[in-house]
């Protein structure tokens, strides 16, 4: 994934920011961070993004 890549689900546009981990129950789980226009980040587990997100959010570049 390239920083700055934009995706949309038809109602809003999100911009890929970074991949980082969050510790949940002693396990490091990779999460994907996206910027939104309203300045509230969208944070989604990488596994969930790979399974579902890429199909729901189409690349708009």
Predicted regions and their residues:
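Intrinsically disordered, low-complexity, charged/polar segments
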Residues: 39-61
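Coiled-coil-like amphipathic alpha-helices with heptad-repeat character
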Residues: 1, 30-31, 52
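Compositionally biased regions
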Residues: 1, 16-18, 61
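Basic/aromatic-rich interaction segments and small domains that mediate binding to polyanionic partners
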Residues: 17-46
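Short, charged beta-turn/beta-strand-edge "cap" motif at the junction between a beta-strand
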Residues: 11-15
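Short coil-to-beta transition motif at edge beta-strands of beta-rich domains
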Residues: 1-10
